[in-house]
Swiss-Prot record:
Any GO molecular function: manganese ion binding
A Pfam family per the record: iPGM_N
Active site: S62
Top-level lineage group: Bacteria
GO biological processes: glucose catabolic process; glycolytic process
Classification of source organism: Bacteria, Bacillati, Bacillota, Clostridia, Eubacteriales
Protein species of origin: Clostridium tetani (strain Massachusetts / E88)
Protein name, per record: 2,3-bisphosphoglycerate-independent phosphoglycerate mutase
Record GO cellular component, one term: cytosol
Length: 513
């Protein structure tokens, strides 16, 4: 039986811009791609920032791109997910955050807010702390203590004073909250089982012992005088009327507002694990909330933002329908069309074949801009001829990997090589009465120079990417505008004539279908 395969061809790093300077995509001789654009419906997709779950204005990347494409929904990074909820007001209804505050009110106890005090956005964000403080204020809780871990890595090394002043001003405005302790992340956020460091942070939090200071600003100024930058500030207890401002006690509530797990695990274990043996410590009965899941094995904690489920990704769903699929790429992008495309799952789905074509062994890809594109093309044509596959996902690495070298002529050659492959593969799919959707995961080689300096640019871009619908039946159809990467999977399923699963929040882009 001759199958009518539906293929997605991802031209990695192939973005669109009208700028001609440094635009390898525009300057390349690509008769096949240009012909497909003339003859078939096409549109542009947003592939950066909030449209792919990244912070506003942040360029896309291959991991995030393939995650969004393969899952058929916008996958929000934890930072963006929480910030979006705060902006939408949803955060203030979070069950676990509210539980922590309500328990403190019920028990007439204190709420302690632990976390990295900066806007670095890698482990935490000061705006998330502010949102919790606001909710505590709105619910009428007064005993709220901030235990500020100081950054100096994801932000400048001596910037903690600004963040301390910022949060103290905010708390003054709210009339809720006081800084109870400070500790450099070197101590409070160790991840290498150097328990002697964590113990110093623990002692400040629970026993109120360590360095002593009458104010947070005074403590940080003293550290700067001693040439100690933020990361290495010794755990310091802030005194009020000569006593620790607020130590952690039985029945207290804690919200650890770091969203990245790796450096939050150890201090969380010290405060919660029943059989903790990193150092001697008294065990407390706490209502402990972690912003995200730090580790499945940590005991006695509740999680404000549980791991996102990627149920019914494109690959999983197609497999559940009993259909066969192929994933094919060269080494550089193989993980992207398999692991990331499947929502971070390593194991192939039932009926999912994988073809890995080795990438060439060269120092940099400008030395061989064709990479292994021709080998990928030959292999996929053989696989199409087998009539086995209902769906094929293919990635050409060249526009991205050669784009990263910053060598314009090499990037131009890379595009021209890929264009030859696009032509041959499209012809073969059309011969089988199938469909090819051509797209990219993010931009890169369409901007090879920094417009402000004129120097080579090697990074990804925030530009839109193409989406071309190639099929014998497509010529009289139209594609909707304003699409995003998450719309690709629903569009492919529509073309395959199957229902879109409810977990996919992307939309079908084919007008009238």
């Amino acid at each position: 039986m001759n199958k009518k395969p539906v293929m997605l061809m991802i031209l990695d790093g192939f973005g669109i811009t009208n700028h001609e300077d440094g635009n390898a995509v525009k300057m390349a001789n690509k008769p096949n791609f240009d012909k497909l654009l003339r003859e078939y419906p096409h549109t542009q997709l947003k592939a950066s920032g909030l449209n792919v779950g990244l912070p506003e204005g942040q360029m896309g990347n291959s991991e995030v791109g393939h995650l969004n494409i393969g899952s058929g929904r916008v996958i929000y990074q934890e930072l963006t997910r929480i910030t979006k909820d705060i902006n939408d007001g949803v955060f203030f209804e979070n069950t676990e955050i509210n539980y922590a505050i309500d328990e403190a009110i019920k028990n007439n106890s204190s709420l302690h807010l632990l976390g990295l005090l900066s806007d670095g956005g890698v482990h935490s964000h000061i705006d998330h702390l502010k949102a919790i403080l606001k909710l505590a204020k709105d619910k009428g809780l007064n005993r709220v203590y901030v235990h500020a871990f100081l950054d100096g890595r994801d932000v400048p090394p001596s910037s903690a004073k600004e963040y301390i002043i910022n949060i103290e001003n905010y708390m003054k405005e709210l009339s809720v909250g006081q800084i109870a302790t400070l500790a450099g992340r070197y101590y409070a956020m160790d991840r290498d089982k150097r328990w002697e460091r964590v113990e110093l942070a623990y002692n400040a939090l629970v026993y109120g012992t360590g360095e002593l200071s009458n104010s947070a600003v005074e403590a940080i100024e003293k550290s700067y005088k001693d040439n100690t930058t933020d990361e290495f500030v010794l755990p310091t207890v802030i005194l009020k009327d000569g006593k620790p401002t607020g130590t952690i006690k039985d029945e207290d509530s804690i919200i650890f507002f770091n969203f990245r797990p790796d450096r939050a695990r150890q201090i969380t274990r010290a405060l919660n694990d029943k059989d903790f043996d990193g150092f001697e410590r008294k065990r407390l009965k706490l209502n402990f909330i972690t912003m995200t899941q730090y580790d499945k094995t940590i005991e006695n904690v509740r999680i404000a933002y549980k791991p996102q489920s990627y149920k019914n990704t494109l690959g999983e769903y197609v497999s559940s329908l009993g259909l066969n699929q192929l994933r094919i790429a060269e080494t550089e992008k193989y993980a992207h069309v398999t692991f990331f495309f499947n929502g971070g799952v390593e194991t192939p789905n039932k009926g999912e074949d994988r073809a890995l074509i080795p990438s060439p062994k060269v120092a940099t890809y400008d030395l061989k801009p064709e990479m292994s594109a021709f080998e990928v093309k030959d292999e996929v044509i053989n696989r199409i001829e087998s009539n086995k596959y209902d769906m094929i996902i293919l990635n050409f690495a060249n526009p991205d990997m050669v784009g990263h070298t910053g060598v314009f002529d090499a990037a131009k050659t890379a595009i021209e090589v890929v264009d030859k492959c696009v032509g041959e593969i499209s012809d073969k799919i059309l011969e089988k009465e199938g469909t090819v959707f051509i797209t990219a995961d993010h931009g890169n080689s369409e901007q090879m120079i920094d417009y402000s300096t004129g120097k080579p640019m090697t990074a990804h871009t925030t530009n839109e990417v193409p989406f071309v619908y190639v099929s014998k039946d497509a010529k009289d159809k139209r594609l909707k505008s304003e699409g995003i990467l998450a719309d690709i999977a629903p569009t492919m399923l529509t073309e395959m004539g199957v229902k879109i699963p409810e977990e996919m929040t992307g939309r079908n882009l084919i007008e009238g279908k």
